[in-house]
Amino acid sequence: MLDIDTILAIIISFLIVLIVMPIVIPFLKYLKFGQVVRDDGPKTHHKKSGTPTMGGLVIGLAIIVTSLIFYKKYPAIGAPLIATVAFGLIGFIDDFIKVVLKRSLGLRAREKLVLQFLISITFLYVIQKHLGSDVYLPVINRYIDLKWAYVPVMSVLMVFTVNAVNLTDGLDGLASGVTMIVSLFLAIISIFSKNHDMAIFSGAIVGSCMGFLRYNAHPAVVFMGDTGSLMLGGSIFAIAVMLKQPVLVLVIGGLYIIEAVSVMLQVLYFKLTKKRIFRMAPLHHHFELLGWDEAKVVVVFWIFTILFCLLALAMIQLKI
């Protein structure tokens, strides 16, 4: 199902993270780039305070190096790579404010959204000029041309996806594991679509997340930080844009969507009733407070991600 170049991309990015991370972790500790844990979070997370963060820098390094290795043969890799780096830069600034300037919430929400929309609009404007404004809708099994609505609609979806991935990054191995599965499926879809450039880029993400899991699985010795989560969110949706499959990526990334919607519902319901739907949002914290072990929550969410990917595959095969 995967061609040799995609497999090589997975292996290369995996090895880069596996080799570089043990060098970077002590350096992050030396710089005191430790995770700031909020007091209103689950009590079991308080012991994670000080765990090195910004490990997403190594994920980014692996994706960049792997992409550059294959760039000459697969030049279309450049487009999602630029989006990935741009969103990673926002995450880096956010992390820097948290861990160095000691402002636990990082960039203000408005600041973050403005930067995210600027990147999304710029990226999508350029893509529209080169690839057009048509997108595939699996529900009606046809391409539709969004025309003038392409940039605004897709920008909203891109920013939503980026922040949904960010919200998913709350448990050891959760965001990295889910993104590894999603990226693997995107690699397969890319090959079926004969888009080998996106297969390679997806493979680079698969390998980097796989390597990162070695250090991020419970009990994590490093976190990706917003550097990693915003970067991965941007990369996932950028691939979807290149494949003209934004709806499909929302299906395979269904776990991200559920996490984000749980936060939106919690906030809205609390404002209206002063009561909460969940014990805590995002949803993974709700299950923690119900007494589920952290590793159990992560594995169950991985399984649901696989099911979402199978649902997407069924939609493709049955032309739903």
From Swiss-Prot:
GO terms for biological process: cell division; cell wall organization; peptidoglycan biosynthetic process; regulation of cell shape. Its EC number is 2.7.8.13. Keywords: Cell cycle, Cell division, Cell membrane, Cell shape, Cell wall biogenesis/degradation, Magnesium, Membrane, Metal-binding, Peptidoglycan synthesis, Transferase, Transmembrane, Transmembrane helix. It comes from the Bacteria. InterPro entries: Glycosyl_transferase_4, PNAcMuramoyl-5peptid_Trfase, PNAcMuramoyl-5peptid_Trfase_CS. The chain crosses the membrane at residues 7-27, 50-70, 77-97, 113-133, 148-168, 173-193, 198-216, 221-241, 247-267, 297-317. Belongs to the glycosyltransferase 4 family. MraY subfamily. This is Phospho-N-acetylmuramoyl-pentapeptide-transferase. It comes from Caldicellulosiruptor bescii (strain ATCC BAA-1888 / DSM 6725 / KCTC 15123 / Z-1320). The lineage of its organism: Bacteria, Bacillati, Bacillota, Bacillota incertae sedis, Caldicellulosiruptorales. The gene is mraY.
